[in-house]
Amino acid sequence: MSRTPRTLLRALSAGTAVGLLAISLTACGGNDTASSTSACKPAHSDLKTITEGELTVASYDYAPATILKGEGVTGMEGDLINEIAKLECLKVTVSTSGGAGAVIPSVQSKRVDIGSGNWLRTKERTKIVYMSTPLWSDPQAIVSKTGLTSDDLEGKVIGSVAGNLWNDSMQKWLGDKFKIYQDDESIYGDLKAGRIDAVVASSASANYRFKSAPIEGATVVNVKPNANVPQFVAVGQVMLPSSLDNAALGKALDEDITKLREDGTIKKLLEKYGIDPSVGEPGAPSEL
């Protein structure tokens, strides 16, 4: 998001976050509100969020990581956020305006508590957001109808979703043949129609998408190191970004994620969405 996920990384223009639309989802013990159950004991009693009793999340559609559904977010990352909210007795509020490009700016400007949508841990992002401990690893891939690899992109028209960590490198390399999109529907629509030759995306996201919306002849080929795109050197680790000014929230996220890994919740969520559960053991935190 990968979406620094479809991937999903993502133009960091705060202006795109104007006018966020908020919708709510209850996420504590299945009750109408988290506060309605006095028996709910938060894992971190000193936790402070933008709105008391709520966990405000900036997100967008990036299946299988985030799937906007009704008034909430599901997908393996969305489900994990809801599990974290249960641990902290919080109601999840989802802000969806602005697409992928609005997520990180919304976290920076404190319009939301956390971002979601396959965001990878990178050195650059350490300067602007608190990066949680890794949720899981996420190989990146080249998606095309002609079997292109990461060595075959020069001279081709390539698409990527706003905010992807490799966007700047690929823009410099490919120039005006590199196109940035705000959402998966647009980018895969252009791939299907032949308006672009390939998409750079999360391998998990592309494979999941093709289960329900296949494109004839499309292949998903994991990237190989390419001197023009330093971000292709290693497999990325997905994280939840939060404000650098709320250290308590960042620490709580780290501890909750660790707990949910140790009790098997993360493994079950990955399996639920058809993802190899081995990616749920990403190793020590690292940055691309």
Language-model features: where?
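Bilobed "Venus flytrap"/periplasmic-binding protein-like clamshell domains
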Residues: 62-64, 71-86, 119-120, 137-189, ...
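Acidic, polar ligand-binding/catalytic clefts
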Residues: 91, 95-153
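Short helix-initiation/N-cap motifs at beta->coil->alpha
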Residues: 93-105, 179-193, 205
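A ligand-binding cleft/hinge motif common to bilobed small-molecule-binding domains
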Residues: 118-126, 197-234
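Periplasmic-binding protein-like
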Residues: 136-141, 215-254, 277-288
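C-terminal motif of bacterial Sec signal peptides marking the signal peptidase cleavage site
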Residues: 23-27
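Extracytoplasmic small-molecule ligand-binding "clamshell" domains
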Residues: 36-118
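Extended ligand-binding regions for polar small-molecule ligands
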Residues: 29, 78-87, 155, 164, ...
